[in-house]
């Protein structure tokens, strides 16, 4: 039975059993745990500076944050790099701008600490260059991580830009804060100490500012979440609120028909809330520029063509699986990373232009209707 329905039934019983019918009874909102329909909009500031303009479904030019808010998006995910000297984006000043834009449109914010000067993912967990001298000194390195997390959040608090959820690392399948080629197996004495330092920084800011920022740990692909959280739990990493998963079917052992299995297992085993914080699907196999797209025909699922309707159906069906399994959110990764004349580390253009929620004329496509369900 739906847990919100149980709360509602208990609330009704509470009213019925009240000794004094004239005495007001305060009832907890049975929908306090809102299902999150999210969008990672980390690229938007850069895309606009590169000349991108966005249009809603009626061909009206509009702020992309407003387009997503009006569609029904209720959570914006923003990445933060430590000191990315190779770009002017995803640093703290850029993140502040993004958070302000999200909050101005009434959307909540998930702040994603990469703890790196560049992309952190299953293949890369590169330590910030400023911390490299302490890479083999877990205590001092943990202090650097703690102070950076604490000071960043304190700075955001002082400008009324605190996020609602914080990720301690991005796709941290491997041990965090490494140099060069990843080392396996995970040194859990080191890894747990560092992760717990980040967690403590968030909890301490909550105490200082009387806030309730929630903490998420993020792993790429559900099958990796199964072993990772088991090892993390055994190593004493237990004080967090959310399990975050990346889910891209082309790289996962679980298809849409079986994704409910690991979701249920993780929720029931660790008694944590769970969200898919990265996913995506192509609406076309055509490329808008010379940058190779991440998704090609290998990304396609039987029954879900590379079309706007196929993309929308994928999102709706994945959301249903997550919800029915006890999960509480889904975030589309970079739905506004449209093609421009600007360059990435690898090419000119976008590697995601066939998987955005905008067509190649930057008009919002059918897939963005996925967010409409949050209004129901």
Give the location of each predicted region.
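Aromatic-rich peripheral "rim/lid" segments of glycoside hydrolase catalytic domains that contact
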Residues: 52, 286-317, 321, 325, ...
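Sec-dependent N-terminal signal peptides
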Residues: 4-14
């Amino acid at each position: 039975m739906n847990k919100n329905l149980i709360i509602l039934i208990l609330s009704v019983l509470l009213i019925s059993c009240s000794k004094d019918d004239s005495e007001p009874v305060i009832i907890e909102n049975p929908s306090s745990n809102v299902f999150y329909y999210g969008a990672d909009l980390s690229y938007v500031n850069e895309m606009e500076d590169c000349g991108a303009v966005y249009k809603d479904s009626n061909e009206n030019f509009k702020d992309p944050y407003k387009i997503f808010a009006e569609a029904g998006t209720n959570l914006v995910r923003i990445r933060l790099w430590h000191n990315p000297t190779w770009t002017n984006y995803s640093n703290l000043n850029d993140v502040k701008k993004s958070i302000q834009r999200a909050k101005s449109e009434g959307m909540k914010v998930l702040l994603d600490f990469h703890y790196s000067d560049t992309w952190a993912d299953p293949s890369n967990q590169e330590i910030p260059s400023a911390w490299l001298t302490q890479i083999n000194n877990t205590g001092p390195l943990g202090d650097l991580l703690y102070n950076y997390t604490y000071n960043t959040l304190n700075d955001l608090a002082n400008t009324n830009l605190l996020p609602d959820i914080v990720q301690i690392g991005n796709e941290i399948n491997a041990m965090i804060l490494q140099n060069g080629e990843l080392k396996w197996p995970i040194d859990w004495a080191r890894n747990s100490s560092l992760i717990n330092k980040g967690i403590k920084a968030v909890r301490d800011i909550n105490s200082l500012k009387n806030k309730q920022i929630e903490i998420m740990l993020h792993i790429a692909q559900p099958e990796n979440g199964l072993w990772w959280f088991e090892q993390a739990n055994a190593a004493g990493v237990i004080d967090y609120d959310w399990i975050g998963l990346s889910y891209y079917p082309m790289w996962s052992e679980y298809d849409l028909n079986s994704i409910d299995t690991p979701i249920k297992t993780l929720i029931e085993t660790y008694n944590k809330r769970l969200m898919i914080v990265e996913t995506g699907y192509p609406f076309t196999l055509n490329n808008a520029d010379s940058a190779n797209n991440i998704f090609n025909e290998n990304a396609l699922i039987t029954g879900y063509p590379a079309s706007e309707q196929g993309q929308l159906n994928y999102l709706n069906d994945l959301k249903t699986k997550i919800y029915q399994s006890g999960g509480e959110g889904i975030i589309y990764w970079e739905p506004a990373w449209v093609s421009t004349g600007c360059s990435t580390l690898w090419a000119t253009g976008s590697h995601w232009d066939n998987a955005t929620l905008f067509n190649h004329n930057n008009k919002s496509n059918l897939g963005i209707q996925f967010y409409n369900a949050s209004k129901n």
